[in-house]
A protein has these predicted regions:
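Short, intrinsically disordered, charge-balanced linker/junction segments flanking boundaries
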Residues: 2-3, 272-287
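Juxta-kinase regulatory segment immediately upstream of eukaryotic protein kinase catalytic domains
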Residues: 5-27
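An alpha-helical support segment within catalytic cores of ATP-dependent transferases
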Residues: 17, 23, 142-152, 157-158, ...
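ATP-binding glycine-rich phosphate-binding loop
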Residues: 27-45
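Active-site acidic catalytic loop and adjacent metal/ATP-binding pocket
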Residues: 41-48, 137, 189-236, 248-249
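ATP-binding pocket architecture of kinase catalytic cores
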Residues: 45-161, 172, 196
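Protein kinase-like catalytic core scaffold
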Residues: 61, 87, 101, 200, ...
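Active-site activation/catalytic loop segments of kinase-like enzymes and analogous catalytic loops
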Residues: 164-173, 234-272
Length: 287
């Protein structure tokens, strides 16, 4: 009465997940495949529902967050915050005590996949869609994010902590010694500029692997992996998108997209820089 493949779920946890999914989907047959994980303790699976002839009738994403109930709640909070503005996965079922969620599945086509061998005009169309999606997220009121959804600030402590990853990991990797006083002064100067920028909702991982082509509607990008969202500088997510660690573009193309984003912010009547040059400077300060 079911078919399962769960390579990375073992023992009692597998039984719990299997039983819960049987309850959620009324004992339908299903196949469960584990997906590559991220750096967290969360595990992700794709569930395919089957009819009696083994024909697929639906598919969803299953999140297993056994030891991260707080993270699970934060995921739900952020999803509810973002859902009216952008295309995030619909929550289908949840069990907070067990640490399980079932979510809408956008499919397997990442933004990065769309760019491969695409002509320049098509690439630009994709980036315009990603920019419009980003500005729609930035239009969500910060007050709503703080009061109704408990989003934290991207504050000095967090910025310091993340910048120190650069000095702790990258600098030793390239074999350079960095004078501590120089580094602390540089961090302080950068943080002061970053905190002075207009504050918006920041996804924190807005890049080509966390944007999906929604298989139900190719005109919309599905946005995933948003649970670490914060309130922070309006340049952060744009840097993640146009200076993506996974995709590289000529600097004149990057500059063009930065200016496009500024225009979109102005059209949406968001707080932004007075001119395109200042906006690009803010983006360059960020990364």
């Amino acid at each position: 009465d079911k078919t399962m493949t769960v390579p990375s779920v073992t023992g009692t946890r597998q039984q719990q997940l299997e039983q819960w999914l049987q309850d959620v989907f009324a004992n339908q047959k299903f196949i469960l495949d584990s997906l590559p994980g991220d750096a967290s303790a969360r595990q992700y699976h794709r569930i395919q529902l089957l009819d009696n002839d083994a024909v697929e009738t639906g598919r969803y994403i299953v999140m297993d967050s056994a030891d991260e109930q707080d993270a699970l709640q934060q995921f739900i909070n952020v999803a509810k915050l973002m859902a009216p503005a952008i295309n995030v996965p619909t929550l289908v079922a949840q069990d907070m005590a067990k640490g399980f969620l079932v979510l809408q599945d956008f499919g397997t086509v990442e933004f990065a996949h769309l760019l491969v061998d695409a002509p320049a005009a098509q690439v630009n169309d994709y980036y315009q869609l990603a920019l419009r999606t980003l500005v729609a997220l930035q239009a969500v009121p910060v007050a709503t994010a703080k009061t109704d959804h408990q989003l934290p600030d991207y504050d000095t402590a967090l910025l310091n902590r993340e910048m120190d990853l650069f000095s702790e990991w990258f600098i030793p990797y390239i074999g350079i010694e960095l004078a501590q006083t120089l580094w602390e002064n540089l961090k302080s100067a950068l943080i002061a500029e970053i905190l002075a920028q207009p504050q918006v909702i920041v996804h924190r991982d807005y890049h080509s692997r966390n944007l999906m082509q929604d298989q139900a509607d190719h005109t919309r990008l599905g946005v995933i992996d948003f649970q670490d969202a914060v309130i922070g500088a309006y340049s952060y997510d744009l840097v993640s998108l146009v200076r993506d660690a996974y995709v590289e573009w000529p600097e004149d193309q990057v500059s063009s997209w930065i200016q496009d984003c500024w225009q979109l912010q102005k059209q949406a009547e968001l707080a932004t820089a007075d001119n395109a040059a200042q906006f690009e400077n803010d983006v360059n300060v960020m990364g």
